[in-house]
Amino acid sequence: MADTNVASELNANVWKIEVAPGDQVGEDDTLIILESMKMEIPIVAPKAGTVKSISVNEGDAVTEGQVLVVLA
């Protein structure tokens, strides 16, 4: 089963990370909350799986298409 990269949909700041490596997540579970122009944007799991890695920290600026989380 191939890993799934979960990327940012826009340029924003990482406001809150809701998961940790090793966590089991379900489809549509919130992984990360981004903040842009005072709006909170949830980034959700596209499928159920296990969080393999998180490549950002709270407070980081991210760009559209940047990989935030890898699910196994």
Predicted regions and their residues:
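Short beta-strand-turn/beta-hairpin segments enriched in glycine/proline and small hydrophobics
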Residues: 1-13, 30-46
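ATP/adenylate-binding site constellation spanning eukaryotic-like Ser/Thr protein kinases
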Residues: 11, 48, 59, 64
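Short histidine-centered loop motifs in beta-beta connectors
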Residues: 16-20, 24, 53-56
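Surface-exposed, flexible loop/turn segments at secondary-structure boundaries
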Residues: 22, 39, 59
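Short hydrophobic beta/alpha edge segments that flank linear recognition/processing sites
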Residues: 26-42, 63-72
